[in-house]
Amino acid sequence: MKKLLVLVALAACGGTAKKPEAPTGRQAKAKRDPVKPAAYKEFEAAMRAVRLGGPEASETARARLRSALKIDNTIWEAWFDLGAIAWKEGDDDEAVDDFSKALDINKGHTPTLMARAEAYRREGKKKEARADYETAAKNMDEDDPNKRDVATRLASLLRDAGDYDDAVEVLRDTVRTSGINAKIYTELGQIYLAQKRYELAQLVLSKAVQMDAKDPAIYNALAILAARQGKPQESFQLFDQAVSLDANFIDARFNKASALLDAGDYARAKTELAAIVEKRPDDYAAVVSLGVAQRGLKAFDEAKKDWDRVVKEAPKKSAPRADALWNLATLKLDFTEDAAGGKADLERYLQEAPSSHARRQDAENKCKEVKCH
């Protein structure tokens, strides 16, 4: 497992909580009582486990953080880091609970609000996520560059929900008070993409390139635009350009692989996905897709091996693990004629996959069709 970082994927938020000193953020001015020495020692042990890394880092850190909180439950940083561990493991209910306890102590702390917003978002609780994004933005000074990043996250939430007018309004309000940047143009382009307003998408994405010609996310969006316009070669070239700008920008390579899978070009998709997995072995979504490519090439044993690995290694409540369980079931039922094994995997999926997982209804219908019980 990679060395634990607290929600590195979150906009305007990253890194583990600092040592328990004074609460951070311009809204947190109240004087704080000293942390009990025994609790501080446990907290430091948790941070040491994080720094050292290794497969047991998260479990060790979690145990130490809980021990610290038994001694002194006012250490908001410990609640924050517990939430981060839960979020990384896909346990969004626990993450929300832990972040909420951190906010009860360090009220209005922007990184914690952003972290909780991301957990709510992944749970599908749009209203709660939106409220936290909006509160985080209000807590920031107008000239804080992170305010524009928070706005793009909120706008993307609204875009995903189909609330395009609200998403555009959020960006316009932010531009009026805090100015424009390439990320705002890029998000606006993605909103227009979702609305199939391709000329406007092209216009604003071109402006994004003018502001930051080295941001791979812009070329990723342009590649998606080209694909929507029926220009596959241009799309692939733009995906490649995004990757050339930042070899660690996996989104472009993954999107290219997804386009290849959709086109039935399983061999090229496999090449792209294998490159992702080689660079990031714990990118379980990529491993699941690699299994799909293997299945398309009729390499059923290899596909099963990929999905078995995800089931074994991925966080128990994560979407990739649920995807792997579903794919194992359909592989056995629809491709290898292992009806008994497929039924067992379907039942396991229904027992272990999150209730909000995209394939749950399909699994329930499939289970009735094959008479699981």
Name each model-derived stretch:
Residues 32, 39, 76-77, 110-111, ...:
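Helix-start (N-cap) detector for alpha-helical repeat units in TPR-like alpha-solenoids
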